[in-house]
Curated annotation (Swiss-Prot):
It comes from Homo sapiens. This is Regulator of G-protein signaling 1. It is a peripheral membrane protein. Residues 85-200 form the RGS domain. Pfam families: RGS. GO terms for biological process: adenylate cyclase-inhibiting G protein-coupled receptor signaling pathway; G protein-coupled receptor signaling pathway; immune response; leukotriene signaling pathway; negative regulation of signal transduction; positive regulation of GTPase activity; response to bacterium; signal transduction. SUPFAM superfamilies: Regulator of G-protein signaling, RGS (SSF48097). Regulates G protein-coupled receptor signaling cascades, including signaling downstream of the N-formylpeptide chemoattractant receptors and leukotriene receptors. Inhibits B cell chemotaxis toward CXCL12. Inhibits signal transduction by increasing the GTPase activity of G protein alpha subunits thereby driving them into their inactive GDP-bound form.
Length: 209
């Protein structure tokens, strides 16, 4: 059986997103100690990291607005559509990135990471399903998972049974729980956040130039 790796390539532009290095897997005491120190410092430096990310992101989007020939230009109208539903937000690659940044600021980025991992899993070739299912389960669903998602006991146990004979839909139940959690909890706050409103205001202002 070929080894399978979970891939969410577009999100790797965001700091610390999907499947960042696990200190326990690093070789050598020096690396482990260094990584432990970085983890302890994260709460102090995260705000600065987020601001730096947004500062680098906004000019890029603004410069894209000026090129009418580009088919991938992000418009203010498109960003406004994100407020219509979580479904529309997640259907847009930049929307995924911006929402992921917001979730990271709330230390709940595991929700979108799991949701995206499930979307990727559904497209997996059948012979790779067992490997990938185990990786997703260990990363997000297992009770000792480093990025454990907030699902009820029954859903967790049901998912554990399903991955023993994995199918493309074995994570659907857990994915639905997490989607509903984001939709009712994080998504409304995102629409009122500086991350979203500043991006929208910048694009609207730029469109008037």
């Amino acid at each position: 059986m070929r080894a399978a790796a979970i891939s969410t390539p577009k999100l790797d532009k965001m700091p610390g997103m999907f499947f960042s290095a696990n200190p326990k897997e690093l070789k050598g005491t020096t690396h482990s100690l260094l990584d432990d120190k970085m983890q302890k410092r994260r709460p102090k430096t995260f705000g600065m990291d987020m601001k730096a990310y947004l500062r680098s992101m906004i000019p890029h989007l603004e410069s894209g607005m000026k090129s009418s020939k580009s088919k991938d230009v992000l418009s203010a109208a498109e960003v406004m559509q994100w407020s219509q539903s979580l479904e529309k937000l997640l259907a847009n690659q930049t929307g995924q990135n911006v929402f992921g940044s917001f979730l990271k600021s709330e230390f709940s980025e595991e929700n979108i990471e799991f949701w995206l991992a499930c979307e990727d899993y559904k497209k997996t070739e059948s012979d790779l399903l067992p490997c990938k299912a185990e990786e997703i389960y260990k990363a997000f669903v297992h009770s000792d998972a480093a990025k454990q998602i907030n699902i009820d006991f029954r859903t967790r146990e049901s998912t554990a049974k399903k991955i023993k004979a994995p199918t493309p839909t074995c994570f659907d139940e857990a994915q639905k729980v997490i989607y509903t959690l984001m939709e009712k909890d994080s998504y409304p706050r995102f629409l009122k956040s500086d991350i979203y409103l500043n991006l929208l205001n910048d694009l609207q202002a730029n469109s008037l130039k």
